[in-house]
């Protein structure tokens, strides 16, 4: 039984009902509907911390989905899972792929910046201030892009950019 049919979460159930109605009204192919069902099940599994199941659903959605914009969100969510698992290099790969398909995805740009900032802090802890500065500059570059797309978001990043003289 698909996850969407066994979900007890009210919000997820509501989303599922609305999505099913939209899929019936809008002109979509069977393949698009199937891709969306896998994506929806992936989001549900991810929300419950079932990352292996979420990844399986996202990979199936990627196999079926042809629209670059829709694929960007699937890739972004795969990146989130890898970030949650501490697999930052893998997460970066997926975030880069997401923004390649959808350059207007500020949350992916933000997450890339967060990873570079984290790596910069690690470099400081290791006593490598030169590497830290390079990593912080990379973080700043991605945060500036994210802020350009979503000016009222990422307030903490905006403050950090001002504090460090990078804005």
From Swiss-Prot:
TPR repeat copies, ranges: 35-68, 72-105, 120-153
A Gene Ontology biological process term: photosynthesis
Compartments reported by the entry: Plastid, Chloroplast thylakoid membrane
Matches recorded under InterPro entries: PSI_Ycf3_assembly (IPR022818), TPR-like_helical_dom_sf (IPR011990), TPR_rpt (IPR019734)
Membrane topology: Peripheral membrane protein
Gene3D superfamilies according to UniProt: Tetratricopeptide repeat domain (1.25.40.10)
Primary subcellular site in the record, as a coarse category: plastid
Protein keywords: Chloroplast, Membrane, Photosynthesis, Plastid, Repeat, Thylakoid, TPR repeat
Coiled coil spans: none
A Gene Ontology cellular-component term: chloroplast thylakoid membrane
Pfam families assigned to the protein according to its UniProt record, in alphabetical order: TPR_1 (PF00515)
Role of this protein: Essential for the assembly of the photosystem I (PSI) complex. May act as a chaperone-like factor to guide the assembly of the PSI subunits.
Family statement: Belongs to the Ycf3 family.
Matching NCBIfam families: PRK02603.1
Name used for this protein in its record: Photosystem I assembly protein Ycf3
Organism in which the protein naturally occurs: Chlorokybus atmophyticus
